[in-house]
């Protein structure tokens, strides 16, 4: 379990693991199972490496300029980019958990915030 006090709900966070915890998890998100490859092609993200880099960049970003966010009691960082409809979740210690474009956009973010979100540091 990660110390949620070491994670910023709204500020910038630095990820020690700059990507998914391993190649299999990255591959599972990009091209196997629930594939996100097709979701990101319109954004010009056409490789799993670009997808992974975008996820880390979003998760390390502070809130503002269309980016909303929170942390969880388990020390995960969640960010939602309203302009691009990207929802990402990850652990600064263990890496990216997921990034995708929710079908219902900001409503998905709001539901997740209500379920698990902590907005203060």
Where are these regions (language model features)?
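Aromatic side chains
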Residues: 29, 51, 70, 80, ...
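Short linear sequence elements within intrinsically disordered, low-complexity coil regions
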Residues: 35, 56, 75, 85, ...
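Basic/aromatic recognition patch in beta-strand/loop cores that engages polyanionic ligands
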Residues: 69-92
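A short, surface-exposed interaction/processing loop segment used at functional sites
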Residues: 88-121
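Compact soluble domain cores
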Residues: 6-75
């Amino acid at each position: 379990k990660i110390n949620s006090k070491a994670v910023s709900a709204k500020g910038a966070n630095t990820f020690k693991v700059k990507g998914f915890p391993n190649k299999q998890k990255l591959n599972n998100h990009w091209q196997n199972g629930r594939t996100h490859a097709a979701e990101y092609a319109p954004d010009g993200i056409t490789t799993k490496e670009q997808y992974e880099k975008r996820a880390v960049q979003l998760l390390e970003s502070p809130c503002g300029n269309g980016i909303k966010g929170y942390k969880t009691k388990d020390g995960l960082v969640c960010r939602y980019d309203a302009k691009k409809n990207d929802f990402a979740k990850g652990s600064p210690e263990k890496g990216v958990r997921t990034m995708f474009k929710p079908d219902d956009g900001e409503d998905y973010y709001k539901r997740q915030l209500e379920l698990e979100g902590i907005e203060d540091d």
